Design a protein with these regions (language model features):
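Solvent-exposed, acidic/flexible segments
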Residues: 59, 97-100, 138-145, 172-176, ...
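N-terminal secretory targeting modules
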Residues: 1-62, 66-87
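Oxyanion-hole/transition-state-stabilizing segment in secreted/luminal serine hydrolases
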Residues: 68-90, 104-146, 151, 155, ...
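Structural recognition of the beta-strand scaffold that forms the well-ordered cores
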Residues: 58-63, 93-98, 122-128, 132, ...
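Catalytic His-Asp segment of secreted/periplasmic serine-dependent ester chemistry enzymes
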Residues: 2-3, 7, 170-221
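Extracytoplasmic/secreted proteins, especially bacterial periplasmic and envelope-associated proteins
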Residues: 4, 8, 61, 102, ...
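Short, glycine/acidic-enriched loop or turn micro-motifs at the edges of active sites
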Residues: 67, 101, 199
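A structural motif corresponding to the C-terminal end of an alpha-helix
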Residues: 152-161, 185-193
Length: 221
């Protein structure tokens, strides 16, 4: 009856507004507050909105803590790899849109709430998914990324979109290799670019090169 009708109407409105809800947890946008001792997620999101409004970026990178603590504005006390940010990312005009502990569905929420609106970026880079591992199946991760990419494309139709595969993790190198193969296939089929970060961070034997990580076997230094 009425409830069914309401669901149909909501679905339609969501389609019109380009904020569809998927059926997998990776396709349902949600906020998060997993690291309140480090930073406030919603405050950072609001800072992003202000940043892109006041300084429309030429390029953006969306991601989790690996991106968050890399460099750029808004500033953060933790930094891994600031020199690389200053040398490569800043001259290329990148705005950092990374939030520590984000999963695919959290980036989806941020995209639905204005982080890619009101400006035209030449380049959008997406590096997300590692925090979904162990929680979601490989299929859900790939489908979540597909869903998120479509939301990105709707908001930045002229940007070139590049997906960076999941970085190798200690003791999960083989899993990362397999899922990146699936992600690459989906990304290229959908017409985006894929970059596999893995090879440079691994040793000959396929294990991660510990000297390139900060000690947790997950975050590059």
């Amino acid at each position: 009856g009425m409830k069914q009708q309401a669901i149909v109407v909501e679905r339609k409105v969501r389609e019109i507004l380009h904020i569809p809800l998927g059926s997998l947890t990776t396709t349902i946008p949600v906020t998060q507050r997993r690291e309140p001792h480090m930073y406030e997620w919603l405050s950072r999101h609001r800072a992003f909105l202000e940043q892109v409004r006041n300084h429309p970026p030429k390029a953006v990178i969306l991601g989790n803590s690996i991106t968050h603590y890399w460099g750029g504005e808004p500033e953060h006390r933790n930094k891994n790899g600031r020199e690389a940010w200053e040398k490569v990312m800043r001259p290329a005009g990148f705005q950092n849109l990374g939030c520590g502990w984000d999963r695919i569905e959290n980036v989806l929420w941020r995209v639905y709430h204005g982080e890619l609106d009101g400006y035209k970026a030449g380049k959008v880079v997406l590096m997300i998914g590692t925090n979904n591992c162990g929680l979601n199946s490989d299929r859900d991760i790939v489908e979540g990324l597909r869903f998120l990419l479509s939301a990105i494309r709707q908001r930045q139709p002229e940007a070139s979109v590049k997906v960076i595969g999941i970085l190798p993790r200690r003791n999960q190198e083989q899993w990362v290799r397999n899922i990146n193969f699936d992600i690459k296939e989906m990304v290229e089929t959908e017409g985006y670019e894929f970059a596999n970060p893995g090879t440079a961070l691994l040793l000959q034997d396929g294990k991660i090169d510990e000297s390139l990580f900060i000690g947790d076997g997950l975050h590059p230094n």
